[in-house]
Amino acid sequence: MDNLDKLIRECGVELYDSEIANENGRAIFRVYITKDGGVSLDDCEKVSRLLSPIFDVTPPVSGDYNLEVSSPGLERKLSKPSHFKASVGELVKVQTEAEKFAGRLVKADEESIAVENEEGIFEINISEIKKAKTYLEW
């Protein structure tokens, strides 16, 4: 993952995350990128053109797959401390083993986050988070 991060930085963007998905029996290697001011279609194309020949030699998954490069989107998965830090001030949904929280992310550091809603402020250790994402109110 570190090598992937370094390669992607050559295109002027940051690696947000990557995942392997399976849709309709086909493997998909998804690469999510970010940059200040937002990701353009040209950014995605640059990263795809950079990674494609490398993955032809050293595939990220075994067998046939499709490579997809995109921004993580407005409603995006949060899994790393850096994701939470960059999302302070946004609305989030967080699930731990015991509880679910929805509210505004008011604090984030390497160890924990704080989510505020009408019931109060809830401090949650990042290690206890099973699933988290940003969301928009419509």
From Swiss-Prot:
The lineage of its organism: Bacteria, Pseudomonadati, Campylobacterota, Epsilonproteobacteria, Campylobacterales. Its main location: cytoplasm. GO terms for cellular component: cytosol. InterPro entries: Ribosome_maturation_RimP, RimP_C, RimP_C_sf, RimP_N, RimP_N_sf. It is found in: Cytoplasm. The keyword Disulfide bond does not apply. One of its GO terms (biological process) is ribosomal small subunit assembly. Keywords: Cytoplasm, Ribosome biogenesis. This is Ribosome maturation factor RimP. The keyword Repressor does not apply. HAMAP family: RimP. Required for maturation of 30S ribosomal subunits. Belongs to the RimP family.
